[in-house]
């Protein structure tokens, strides 16, 4: 989630502090967590909180700092199918389980009675790397589909029943954009930048809601207070106008008061999040 905005933050911050240099790479939440744990980077970021096992394996305490709210969109590329597709959780789960294989499947047609759905094969595109985006998306599917929860579950790395893997949000975005019949899940900014069509998703209120600043903010607004470790989940929360696949993205900050690089990181975060 955080890569598009954090690179903008770096650029703006360096205008005020030219002594600081940043080298940030979008390698997926799984890769970011591994680098933080191996202490090869000064800080990291993740779209899925570190597990208790991961935190216990850290050489130094690590704080989760919620930095932004984002959303996982369901992007598609189908010739003749204009923007405005609606999907509910059960249908999404069945697509990614490999049970719904045609775009004119009755389950899709029932939700989209006015859409001209072609008999095109559905190509599922999913992440091949350890991914917080995958964790967010699979957590949503596990919440709305008993079959998905029992057969696949949720996490940064899961055993996909079907589909072609691509690396990073960038890879999934590119694969969907160039393939007729493709469907995949990507962070909102990537869908917008690539001008991909995205589906409106059914929330707990029964509303079909598109991902937007407003609908993501509404998801965050349902959270009245943070837990002590700041790792609260707002995926599929109940609220009017909520986009159901919304989530925080966290900065992972090792605790080492004597570290000069970490002092610089804390100063940057104080500027970025004030």
Task: Enumerate the predicted regions with their spans.
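Flexible loop/hinge segments at secondary-structure junctions
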Residues: 1-274
């Amino acid at each position: 989630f955080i890569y598009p905005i954090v690179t903008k933050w770096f650029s703006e911050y360096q205008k005020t502090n030219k002594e600081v240099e940043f080298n940030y790479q979008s390698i997926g939440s799984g890769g970011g967590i591994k680098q933080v744990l191996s202490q090869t980077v000064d800080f990291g970021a993740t779209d899925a909180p570190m597990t208790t096992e991961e935190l216990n394996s850290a050489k130094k305490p690590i704080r989760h700092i919620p930095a932004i709210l984002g959303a996982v969109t369901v992007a598609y590329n189908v010739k003749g199918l204009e923007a405005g597709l609606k999907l509910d959780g059960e249908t999404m789960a069945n697509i990614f389980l490999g049970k719904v294989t045609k775009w004119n499947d009755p389950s899709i047609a029932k939700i989209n009675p006015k859409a001209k759905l072609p008999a095109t094969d559905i190509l599922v595109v999913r992440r091949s790397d350890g991914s917080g985006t995958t964790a967010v998306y699979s957590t949503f599917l596990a919440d709305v589909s008993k079959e998905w929860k029992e057969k696949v579950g949720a996490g940064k790395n899961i055993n996909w029943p079907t589909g072609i893997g691509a690396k990073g949000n960038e890879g999934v975005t590119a694969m969907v954009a160039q393939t007729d019949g493709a469907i995949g899940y990507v962070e909102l900014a990537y869908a917008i930048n690539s001008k991909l069509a995205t589906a409106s998703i059914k929330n707990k209120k029964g509303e079909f809601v598109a991902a937007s600043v407003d609908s993501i903010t509404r998801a965050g607004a349902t959270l009245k207070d943070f837990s002590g470790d700041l790792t609260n989940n707002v995926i599929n929360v109940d609220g009017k106008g909520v986009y159901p696949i919304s989530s925080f993205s966290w900065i992972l900050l090792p605790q080492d008061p004597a570290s000069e690089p970490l002092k610089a990181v804390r100063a940057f975060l104080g500027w970025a999040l004030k």
